[in-house]
Amino acid sequence: MARTSKAGFPDPVLITTTEDLTGVVERLRREPFVSIDTEFVRERTYWPELCLVQLAGQDEVVVVDTLAPGIDLAPLGVLLDDPEVVKVFHAARQDLEIFLYLFGHLPAALFDTQVAAMVAGFGDQVGYDNLVASLTGAHIDKAHRFSDWSARPLSEAQIAYAAADVTHLRTVYQLLLERLEREGRLDWVASDLAVLSDPATFRPDPETLWERMRPRTSNRRMLGVLRAITAWREREAQRVNVPRQRLLKDESLLEIAATAPADVDALARIRGVSRGFAEGKSGTGILEAVAAARALPDGALPRQQKGKEGPRPSPALVALLKVLLAACCEEHDVAPRLVASSEDLDRLALEPEPDLPLLQGWRRTVFGDEALALKDGRMLLGVDGTRVKRIPA
């Protein structure tokens, strides 16, 4: 019989061999759901370096040492691929990115308790510690939050801390599931989990990453160079497994785009670009990207991101839509962030009926229909005490 901790959970077992991992997976595949978390380091690499995988079933909790010599993680992939076992995460994006990189595809049958908590009225992007405390009354020891998980050996305290991320998660999942079923909101969660099940969510197009830098120019030739060198940096950072900012900072990319250097000497004069970088393979790659962008016909050059040019939404209308969004979400006890973003409200204010999530499914019921009515003048907003009142026009 497995020993249990003071909290009533089985004591965690450290897994360091493929044989033991295979046995764990065989047992966990008989369960309806398994809670999962990871510990990793990423300060020195582009791709996360997976250090631990924590798994919890009904009667066992394991911490898999993914850095143990000779361990093969293929059995873990079998568990992740099993559509009959729900894989429960909290704030799953980074965990899923790791598994996508490791196995080439995403786990089947996902559930994210952070998404579920937003639907269930626990606010925007509620943290795991706060959610555990709200639902179970338990408080998680944070002493090892900033551990170097790549260092070995692991202490018993580190193993216990890592295990707590999946033991309490089982209880949180069950309580949230009951609440969502009772309120008829499971389908609300499903639509957002579909995004997490799409590999494109974790593989941004290198050709669009330049837009994140929000360059303050409408010069299309400069934007074309910026697009080319930003895409080069992303692919090169992935290839050599170095953080993109360590390879070449955004500020340097913007200056390269503005000056479009044509040779090594000009490139080496850019702030943040060393002579060694300019003379090496990386410098050659940058100069080739600049030259290719300079040779593009005008019609192939990018334009500034939407919102930087052209008509702007009415600030007053956007402000009213934000007030209405807050009122609708308070009434339905759902996080506003999950219903509509600021960019969504800007588009709604500008376009007759844009193709946006807020005008589809449950979001339209909660907010979208009323937002259209407000925009079209079929609804007025007033104040009744401390509450926003909607008045048919």
Curated annotation (Swiss-Prot):
HRDC domain sequence ranges: 219-300
Gene Ontology annotations for the cellular component aspect, listed alphabetically:
cytoplasm
**Which cofactor(s) does the record list?**
a divalent metal cation
User: Sorted alphabetically, which SMART domains does this protein's record hold?
Assistant: 35EXOc, HRDC
Q: What PROSITE patterns would the database entry show?
A: HRDC
Its main subcellular localisation, reduced to a broad class, is: cytoplasm
Q: Which reaction does it catalyse?
A: Exonucleolytic cleavage that removes extra residues from the 3'-terminus of tRNA to produce 5'-mononucleotides
UniProt-listed Pfam families: DNA_pol_A_exo1 (PF01612), HRDC (PF00570)
Q: Which GO terms describe its biological process?
A: tRNA 3'-end processing
Q: Does the keyword Glycoprotein apply?
A: no
Q: Which residues form the 3'-5' exonuclease domain?
A: 14-181
What keywords sit in the KW lines?
Cytoplasm, Exonuclease, Hydrolase, Nuclease, tRNA processing
Q: Where in the cell is it found?
A: Cytoplasm
Molecular function per GO: 3'-5' exonuclease activity; nucleic acid binding; nucleotide binding; ribonuclease D activity
SS bonds (residue pairs): none
Q: What is its EC number?
A: 3.1.13.5
Q: What does this protein do?
A: Exonuclease involved in the 3' processing of various precursor tRNAs. Initiates hydrolysis at the 3'-terminus of an RNA molecule and releases 5'-mononucleotides.
- Family to which this protein belongs: Belongs to the RNase D family.
Cross-referenced HAMAP family: RNase_D
**This chain belongs to which protein, by name?**
Ribonuclease D
